[in-house]
């Protein structure tokens, strides 16, 4: 009845032995075996007995062993609008799509590269735009942090990079590749370090591309804010500001624009299109001049004005400015007012 016991023992031994293979070599590292300090008895008591056979030395190990670099490969940052990368691409490469407002995509990328070189106080040693290549001079892509008190004696690595632009035939997409071609430094140039440096150089250009396009978008919004205010006449022959924008669009938003120019809206007549507003000049403060937010001053006197918004025969909109008595402003005043309003639209980036 007990014949199964030896077999069961044999199986259990085999299983236990096979399970030993799952342990890594660090499982029995000496750091895992420690003995604490022996119990310290008070002076009035005797020390507990301890068998010398089982006595172990107290282990002294540093809790901060030598650091090992486990940093992952660097990533190309697709922060710029219209930028993307291909999965599993081994090169430091990014693609740019031609966004609205960019006339020549390759020129926009070249300007971004040149701006990065200027920030690093270097220039290109080789430049061939027909081949789409640029080789930089020596510079430090990674700059150590400096202390204002002690300075920094740490040696700086220097690199030279080759940037390559490849534009598709349709000129709507272009790729930019960064390649490390030379290196000076105390550290050994490993494959990981090479990849990190290349991606870092590429990301600097991507950041500059993103910054420049954001500025371009702001300029485009400012240009869109101009409603083509021109001197003209309303349907009754009075001097007025004329725009090609539709009546409903101008009438709905023009009162809000006036409030940004120190006007206080008194009345809006939806039926006649007449806006009555009080104008008071605002004194600029020191903080306004520092932050570039000085109020726009119009070439008109303080007081109440009436602005008649009307449809033109051409399908646009006319703005007839009158004083508090309902008399149309002089053509010279209208000319200065037209220039001031356009400047305000551009400065604030307002789109009516």
Swiss-Prot record:
Cell compartment(s), UniProt: Cell outer membrane
GO cellular component: cell outer membrane
Topology relative to the membrane: Lipid-anchor
GO annotation terms (biological process): Gram-negative-bacterium-type cell outer membrane assembly; protein insertion into membrane
Residues where lipid is bound covalently (N-palmitoyl cysteine): 20
Covalent lipid sites (S-diacylglycerol cysteine): 20
Keyword Signal: yes
Entry similarity comment: Belongs to the BamC family.
Function of the molecule: Part of the outer membrane protein assembly complex, which is involved in assembly and insertion of beta-barrel proteins into the outer membrane.
Protein name: Outer membrane protein assembly factor BamC
Lineage: Bacteria, Pseudomonadati, Pseudomonadota, Gammaproteobacteria, Alteromonadales
């Amino acid at each position: 009845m007990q014949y199964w016991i030896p077999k069961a023992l044999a199986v259990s031994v085999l299983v236990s032995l096979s399970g030993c293979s799952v342990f890594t070599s660090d499982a029995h590292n000496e750091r895992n075996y420690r003995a604490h300090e022996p119990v310290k008895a008070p002076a009035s008591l005797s020390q507990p007995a301890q068998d010398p056979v089982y006595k172990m030395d107290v282990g002294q190990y540093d809790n901060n062993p030598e650091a090992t670099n486990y940093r992952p490969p660097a990533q190309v940052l697709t922060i710029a609008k219209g930028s993307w990368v291909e999965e599993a691409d081994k090169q430091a490469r990014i693609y740019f799509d031609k966004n609205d407002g960019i006339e020549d995509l390759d020129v926009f990328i070249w300007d971004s590269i040149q701006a990065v070189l200027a920030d690093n106080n270097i220039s290109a040693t080789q430049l061939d735009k027909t081949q789409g290549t640029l080789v930089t001079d020596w510079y430090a892509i990674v700059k150590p942090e400096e202390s204002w008190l002690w300075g920094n004696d740490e040696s700086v690595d220097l690199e030279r990079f080759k940037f390559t632009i490849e534009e598709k035939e349709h000129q709507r997409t272009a790729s930019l590749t960064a390649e490390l071609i030379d290196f000076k430094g105390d550290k050994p140039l490993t494959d990981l370090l090479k990849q990190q440096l290349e991606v870092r150089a590429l990301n600097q250009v991507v950041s500059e591309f993103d910054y420049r396009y954001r500025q371009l978008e702001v300029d485009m919004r400012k240009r869109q804010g101009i409603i083509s205010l021109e001197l003209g006449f309303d349907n009754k022959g009075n001097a007025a500001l004329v725009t090609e924008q539709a009546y409903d669009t101008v009438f709905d938003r023009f009162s809000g624009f006036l409030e940004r120019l120190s006007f206080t809206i008194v009345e809006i007549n939806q039926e006649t299109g007449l806006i009555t507003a009080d104008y008071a000049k605002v004194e600029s403060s020191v903080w306004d001049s520092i932050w570039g937010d000085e109020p726009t001053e119009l070439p008109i006197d303080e007081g109440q004005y009436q602005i008649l918004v009307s449809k033109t025969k051409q399908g646009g909109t006319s703005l007839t400015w009158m004083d508090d008595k309902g008399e149309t402003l002089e053509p010279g005043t209208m000319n200065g007012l037209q220039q001031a309003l356009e400047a305000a639209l551009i400065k604030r980036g307002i789109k009516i």
